[in-house]
C-alpha cells in the first residue's frame, strides 16, 4: 500500500504557477479533498500533511528544497517513517506528455528530470511509482523552428488553455487514486491511460 505521495516543485511564491510545480498543484487539491493541512517540517526539508486512508497513515510531502535536491526531503521522511520505495508515489511534471495527459508508471529512467534523479540517488533505486502530468515540450510549441530553452519553459506559467488541460489531468489522476491506493494498480493505469 502507498504510504507517501510526493509532489515535486520548487518552493517560493515566484514559482507557484510554474509548469515545474504541477506535482505541488496535485497535492494541494488532494490535501483539500482529504481535509489535511501542510505544515513545515524542518527534519524532512519540506511541508508535510498527514491523512488517513482506509485507516492507514498517508503522508503528503512537498519538498522545500529546490527540485534538484528533492531526494534529500524524500529520503529523510522515508527513513524516519520506514517507508520503502514501493510504497511511494511521486507526482511530477512531464515534458514528454502533452498537457491534459497523465500516466502512471513503476520504475524506469528519469527522462532528464532532476527531481527524479535526486530521489533515485537517495533511495538507491528507480523502483517507485510515478504519476506523470503532461506539460508539453517547448519544441512542440515554438512553432518558428527555433528551439526554446527547456529550463526557461518549465519555470514559466502555462497559457490558460494549457492550464485547463493540466488541471483536467490532475482531476483524472485524483479520480483513479482510490484504486491505486488500495493496490489495484493495473485497473488504475488502464482507467487513467484511457482518458487521453
Swiss-Prot record:
Q: Name one GO cellular component term.
A: cytoplasm
**Record keywords:** Cytoplasm, Hydrolase, RNA-binding, tRNA-binding
User: What InterPro entries would the database entry show?
Assistant: Pept_tRNA_hydro (IPR001328), Pept_tRNA_hydro_CS (IPR018171), Pept_tRNA_hydro_sf (IPR036416)
Q: Which Gene3D superfamilies match?
A: Peptidyl-tRNA hydrolase
Please name the GO terms of the biological process aspect recorded for this protein, alphabetically. Answer: protein quality control for misfolded or incompletely synthesized proteins; rescue of stalled ribosome
Which top EC class is given?
Answer: hydrolase
Q: Which PROSITE patterns match?
A: PEPT_TRNA_HYDROL_2 (PS01196)
Location in or out of the cell? Cytoplasm
The EC number of this protein is 3.1.1.29
Can you tell me which residues form the catalytic site? Answer: 20 (proton acceptor)
Matches recorded under SUPFAM superfamilies: Peptidyl-tRNA hydrolase-like (SSF53178)
Q: Site (Discriminates between blocked and unblocked aminoacyl-tRNA): which residue positions?
A: 10
Describe the reaction catalysed, as an equation: an N-acyl-L-alpha-aminoacyl-tRNA + H2O = an N-acyl-L-amino acid + a tRNA + H(+)
Any idea which GO molecular function terms this record carries? Answer: peptidyl-tRNA hydrolase activity; tRNA binding
Q: Which residues bind tRNA?
A: 15, 66, 68, 114
Where's it mainly located?
A: cytoplasm
Q: Which portions of this protein are annotated as coiled-coil regions? A: none
Q: Where is this site: Stabilizes the basic form of H active site to accept a proton?
A: 93
Record text on subunit structure and interactions: Monomer.
Family that this chain belongs to: Belongs to the PTH family.
What does the UniProt function comment say about this protein? Answer: Hydrolyzes ribosome-free peptidyl-tRNAs (with 1 or more amino acids incorporated), which drop off the ribosome during protein synthesis, or as a result of ribosome stalling.
Its protein name is Peptidyl-tRNA hydrolase
Gene encoding the protein: pth
Amino acid at each position: 500500500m502507498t504510504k507517501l505521495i510526493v509532489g515535486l516543485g520548487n518552493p517560493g511564491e515566484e514559482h507557484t504557477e510554474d509548469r515545474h510545480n504541477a506535482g505541488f498543484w496535485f497535492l494541494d487539491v488532494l490535501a483539500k479533498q482529504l481535509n489535511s493541512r501542510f505544515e513545515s517540517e524542518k527534519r524532512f526539508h519540506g511541508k508535510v500533511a498527514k491523512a488517513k486512508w482506509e485507516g492507514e497513515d498517508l503522508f503528503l510531502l512537498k519538498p522545500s528544497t529546490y527540485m534538484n535536491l528533492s531526494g534529500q526531503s524524500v529520503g529523510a521522511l522515508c527513513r524516519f517513517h520506514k517507508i520503502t520505495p514501493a510504497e511511494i508515489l511521486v507526482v511530477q511534471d512531464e515534458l514528454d506528455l502533452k498537457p491534459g495527459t497523465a500516466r502512471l508508471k513503476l520504475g524506469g529512467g528519469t527522462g532528464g528530470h532532476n527531481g527524479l534523479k535526486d530521489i533515485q540517488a537517495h533511495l538507491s533505486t528507480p523502483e517507485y511509482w510515478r504519476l506523470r502530468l503532461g506539460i508539453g515540450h517547448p519544441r512542440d510549441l515554438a512553432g518558428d523552428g527555433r528551439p526554446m530553452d527547456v529550463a526557461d519553459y518549465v519555470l514559466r506559467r502555462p497559457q490558460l488553455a494549457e492550464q485547463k488541460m493540466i488541471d483536467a489531468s490532475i482531476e483524472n489522476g485524483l479520480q483513479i487514486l482510490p484504486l491505486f491506493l488500495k493496490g489495484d494498480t493495473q485497473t488504475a493505469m488502464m482507467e487513467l491511460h484511457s482518458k487521453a
